[in-house]
Every structure is written in structure tokens, then in C-alpha cells.
């Protein structure tokens, strides 16, 4: 169903572990399961209900209808959109998270249909309110046409994902430059450069008698002060 192949998903190790990026994983899951928000106001919406049956079985396409716009990827408008319902439609679209897509289903949604000639309260096309990605003409469109529209939307998503990947690869390039380092003394043995860093002798290297004389002189100096 998905015409886009993700090259990073093909990289497998000997233990059959797939290595990929989070963006490719989210895009792959979005292509496999689109969550539509059904916005039906007229008779065209009845044709979408035919997809629920066993003949077309829209579950095999990964469609999971959602009742909240904050959980939806697609808003599917079907039927006549009036001036009174226009603010509600725009508000639902604005509440959807990015990326979001719109499918205009039916002649009444696309152009206003037969109500656009003499009705003062009908919106002449839903694309005057929100951007439309797929137009689905018909009065009403058949369930086969709805499946074809979803398939075309998936191809559109695949193309956008590929273009985004190419853009990211061109923008996020890594450039290297040569730096000149001064080779100093090896620090693995603990012999630091005395000119740069002063290292006091440790107490283990001082003889025990000299150490006692040093302590007694320090203590007497403290008593005098």
C-alpha cells in the first residue's frame, strides 16, 4: 500500500535488529494508520459509512476514526457547509496537530453544489475556509472513490516525507576543518610540564625525618604567630 521505502528501515544487524530514526518511525506509522476526523453535514457522509462494512473494510487501511481533533491526522468534510457552521469547521482544523490534511468529499463541499446558486447561507467551496489536499467529486462519491482518495493522500505523504528528508540532509551537513595542535609531553606517566603547571612533591617522596622536621617547624611557627 505504501509506495515509499525507508532506506534506514532496511538496515538490519545479524540479530535482526532494525536501526532507524525517530522521524522515520513516526512517518512510517502515520502512513500505516491515518486517524480521520469525520465532519459530515449532509447525505455524502452516508457513503463513508459504507466503508465500515465487511465489503470494503476500512480497518485494513489503518483508518481509526477519532472524535477529538487533537488526535486526528485528517479531517474529512462531507456535505454542505453553511455560514453558521464555517467557524466551527475552522476551529476544528486549527485544533488539529501538525501535520494535518483535508479531504473534501462531494460536490456540495467542493463547490457548494446545487445550493450555491440561490442560497445566501452556503459556502461556495470549503477551500475558502481551510486548505484542501484531496478533492473527491461526486454526488455522492462511491466508497471505491473514497479508498482511492486515501491511497492518493498516502502517496502525497510519502512524497512529502522524501522531500523533507532530502532537505534535512542538505541543511544538516557536517563540515570539518583542520586544526593545528602543538605536540606536548606525554601525560600518561604523570610527568607534567613544570613550566605550565607546578607540581609539589608528594609526601611519599619526602624522607620521614625531613617530614618530622618540617611539621615541627610549621607548628612552632604557628605558636609564635
Swiss-Prot record:
GO cellular component, one term: chloroplast thylakoid membrane
Highest taxon of the lineage: Eukaryota
GO molecular-function terms, A-Z: 4 iron, 4 sulfur cluster binding; iron ion binding; NADH dehydrogenase (ubiquinone) activity; quinone binding
The protein's Enzyme Commission number: 7.1.1.-
Cofactor binding annotation: Binds 1 [4Fe-4S] cluster.
Topological relation to the membrane, as annotated: Peripheral membrane protein
BP GO terms, sorted: aerobic respiration; electron transport coupled proton transport; photosynthesis, light reaction
Localization terms from the record: Plastid, Chloroplast thylakoid membrane
Annotated positions binding [4Fe-4S] cluster: 43-44, 108, 139
Keyword line: 4Fe-4S, Chloroplast, Iron, Iron-sulfur, Membrane, Metal-binding, NAD, NADP, Plastid, Plastoquinone, Quinone, Thylakoid, Translocase, Transport
Keyword Membrane: yes
KW Plastid (keyword) present: yes
Required cofactor(s): [4Fe-4S] cluster
Reactions catalysed: a plastoquinone + NADH + (n+1) H(+)(in) = a plastoquinol + NAD(+) + n H(+)(out); a plastoquinone + NADPH + (n+1) H(+)(in) = a plastoquinol + NADP(+) + n H(+)(out)
Pfam families reported in the protein's UniProt record: Oxidored_q6
Function: NDH shuttles electrons from NAD(P)H:plastoquinone, via FMN and iron-sulfur (Fe-S) centers, to quinones in the photosynthetic chain and possibly in a chloroplast respiratory chain. The immediate electron acceptor for the enzyme in this species is believed to be plastoquinone. Couples the redox reaction to proton translocation, and thus conserves the redox energy in a proton gradient.
Subunit structure: NDH is composed of at least 16 different subunits, 5 of which are encoded in the nucleus.
Family assignment from sequence similarity: Belongs to the complex I 20 kDa subunit family.
NCBIfam families named among the record's database cross-references: nuoB_fam, PRK06411.1
Protein name per UniProt: NAD(P)H-quinone oxidoreductase subunit K, chloroplastic
Organism: Illicium oligandrum (Star anise)
Amino acid at each position: 500500500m505504501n509506495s515509499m521505502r525507508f532506506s534506514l528501515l532496511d538496515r538490519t544487524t545479524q540479530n535482526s535488529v532494525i536501526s532507524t530514526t525517530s522521524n522515520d518511525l513516526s512517518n512510517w506509522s502515520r502512513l500505516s494508520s491515518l486517524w480521520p476526523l469525520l465532519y459530515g453535514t449532509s447525505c455524502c457522509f452516508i457513503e463513508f459509512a459504507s466503508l465500515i462494512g465487511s465489503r470494503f473494510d476500512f480497518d485494513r487501511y489503518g483508518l481509526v476514526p477519532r472524535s477529538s481533533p487533537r488526535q486526528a491526522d485528517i479531517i474529512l468534510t462531507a456535505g454542505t457547509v453553511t455560514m453558521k457552521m464555517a467557524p466551527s469547521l475552522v476551529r476544528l482544523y486549527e485544533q488539529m496537530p501538525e501535520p494535518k490534511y483535508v479531504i473534501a468529499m462531494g460536490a456540495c463541499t467542493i463547490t457548494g453544489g446545487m445550493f450555491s446558486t440561490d442560497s445566501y447561507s452556503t459556502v461556495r467551496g470549503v477551500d475558502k475556509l481551510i486548505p484542501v489536499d484531496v478533492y473527491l467529486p461526486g454526488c455522492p462519491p462511491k466508497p471505491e472513490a473514497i479508498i482511492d482518495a486515501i491511497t492518493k493522500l498516502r502517496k502525497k505523504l510519502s512524497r512529502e516525507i522524501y522531500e523533507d528528508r532530502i532537505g534535512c540532509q542538505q541543511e544538516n551537513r557536517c563540515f570539518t576543518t583542520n586544526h593545528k595542535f602543538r605536540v606536548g609531553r606525554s601525560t600518561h606517566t604523570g610527568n607534567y610540564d613544570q613550566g605550565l603547571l607546578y607540581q609539589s612533591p608528594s609526601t611519599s617522596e619526602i624522607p620521614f625525618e625531613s617530614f618530622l622536621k618540617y611539621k615541627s617547624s610549621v607548628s612552632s611557627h604557628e605558636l609564635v604567630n
